[in-house]
Amino acid sequence: MQSRLSDWLVKHELVHRSLGFDYQGIETLQIKTEDWDSIAVISYIYGYNYLRSQCAYDVAPGGFLASVYHLTRIQYGIDKVEEVCLKVFVSRNNPRIPSVFWIWKSADFQERESYDMLGISYANHPHLKRILMPESWIGWPLRKDYITPNFYEIQDAR
């Protein structure tokens, strides 16, 4: 069984891979980085007009980083919304993914947090800078290979 979006992508020969369904029956699809821009636009046009959340995680020490998008298709007059989870995996050596800020404005702070914590750079994001850590912070704190500095700058709390 595939989601309607997955069926549509197969029909139009757009490359993706199903990673299965979660406990709520929501399908997770793996999207190639080079296809993410077009599949994001297609998802929006297909009706996934709400970005419920975007997050990122480190898959394994020295391995890939993942940017995860939970999309919801909300249409007037339907009782049950459709949801899909899209994952884009990138190399930690060059973690660059096209931003979807221009499609879903709610991606703004979420992509910035993923950048701040894991170092994933979102191409064409208009405000890509640290959001939680100070600008002077070195490294990406949520990467599994992150080495915590043995010093912390004491800051005036005034």
Curated annotation (Swiss-Prot):
Q: Which reaction does it catalyse?
A: a plastoquinone + NADH + (n+1) H(+)(in) = a plastoquinol + NAD(+) + n H(+)(out); a plastoquinone + NADPH + (n+1) H(+)(in) = a plastoquinol + NADP(+) + n H(+)(out)
Q: Where in the cell is it found?
A: Plastid, Chloroplast thylakoid membrane
- Which keywords label this protein? Chloroplast, Membrane, NAD, NADP, Plastid, Plastoquinone, Quinone, Thylakoid, Translocase, Transport
The GO cellular component terms are: chloroplast thylakoid membrane
| An example Gene Ontology biological process | photosynthesis, light reaction
> What is the main EC category here?
translocase
Single GO MF annotation: quinone binding
Q: Which family does it belong to?
A: Belongs to the complex I 30 kDa subunit family.
Q: What is this protein called?
A: NAD(P)H-quinone oxidoreductase subunit J, chloroplastic
Give the species.
Dioscorea elephantipes
